[in-house]
């Protein structure tokens, strides 16, 4: 064989060796299940909203950018829409029983933040008191919050919010 053929063969071997090692390493790593992946995505989306809402800092920390064609509505409807839609989607998952898995720990943390967020949403003294009236959009957004109670109906934690539920009911009645 000619010297150039040996060089090509050596080059191919050098290039393929790291690929083989990477493939072997990948097999050793734990494969993430679809559930783990989506629970992680859910936590990443919900944690910034719920942690801030529970501390009364959502409206302070969530910057709202308006379109040049904004129709002039009060931009505070954004916070109610954000919290309401998030909770409507999250409530069934938060209703699952606690466990010691990574998902269960994240779920428990989100539930704790969410329960405090509900309280702040209806507390007129909270910086995160939501805009319940003054705008037609609030009726739609309030419906998402109400839906979260329906979708999380079997949750012991949500049932503990009886006074907050009454406050939410009172606020919904003020929507336009």
Residue ranges of model-derived segments:
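Bacterial Sec-dependent N-terminal signal peptides
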Residues: 1-27
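Ser/Thr/Asn(+Pro)-rich, low-complexity disordered segments
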Residues: 23-176
């Amino acid at each position: 064989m000619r010297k150039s053929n040996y060089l090509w063969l050596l080059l191919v071997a050098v290039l393929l060796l790291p690929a083989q090692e990477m493939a072997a390493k990948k097999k050793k790593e734990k494969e993430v299940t679809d559930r783990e992946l989506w629970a992680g995505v859910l936590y990443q989306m919900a944690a910034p909203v719920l942690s801030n809402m529970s501390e009364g800092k959502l409206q302070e920390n969530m910057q709202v950018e308006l379109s040049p064609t904004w129709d002039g509505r009060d931009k505070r409807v954004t916070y109610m829409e954000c919290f309401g839609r998030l909770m409507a989607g999250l409530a069934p998952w938060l209703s699952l029983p606690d466990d010691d898995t990574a998902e269960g720990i994240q779920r428990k943390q989100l539930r704790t933040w969410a329960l405090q967020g509900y309280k702040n949403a209806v507390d007129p003294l909270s910086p995160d008191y939501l805009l319940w009236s003054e705008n037609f959009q609030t009726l739609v957004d309030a419906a998402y919050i109400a839906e979260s109670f329906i979708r999380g109906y079997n949750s012991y934690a949500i049932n503990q919010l009886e006074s907050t539920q009454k406050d939410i009911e009172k606020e919904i009645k003020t929507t336009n």
